[in-house]
Amino acid sequence: MKKEMTTFAAMSLMRYYRKGTVRKINKWLGKQPTDPYMKFKEIEFFSELLTNLQPVRCLEYGSGISTPFFLKLLPDNAQWHSVENLPKWYDIVKAQLTSDRIHLHLVDAKEDPNQEAATDVYANFAEQLEGEFDFILVDGINRENCIDVADKYLAKNGLLVVHDANRVQYHSHIKQFKNWKIIQDFRKTAGGFGLASNDLDLEKLVSWNEHSQAWKADTNISNFFKFKFLIGGGKPFKLEHS
């Protein structure tokens, strides 16, 4: 079993690193990326999650040009609402969107760690969209507030996903839900996912064992080549759950 796990992780890493190299070459050549601005292990994780969940009504805090990439994985009747607070970035994203199933919303709000969740117009913008959501992605500003108010906007069997869950300040907020999982790698300020729901069985959403093998191997390799193991600064792979 150990040999099989090692083989699986090695094959996954080869795939991730190959795609990462192509992305860097294309960036050097000035080509506009079409894949999400995530590490490829995160793209595969997130893609499998959406494919299995098949949400119809989606809400995203923090818009991105990668939204059409993920929309292709959803049902034909899926609608994706994206909330953005930066006018210039809003214009950039809007200019590249062609699907009438993606709805971009500009909200006058700023990052404010002292803003209370109940009065946060950014976190509570979902009230203006009416109805509940099958899926909510938190990847913008005031993330703690967005997590704290998410439950009142989630439909039955709805799922909350928090990107950059390597940031420990999000963990206590994610853990307020009945069911939660947090997968982390070697990074401290970016990457990682937190999943939460009061209804869903999170075990069935992705192949946790397989992804854990690959994420752990990637973390070990990164810590080694950055010599973090010598100075005690290496951050280990971690998968926590409720």
Question: Predicted regions span which residues?
Answer:
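A short alpha-helical cap/connector motif
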Residues: 1-135, 142-155, 159, 165-242
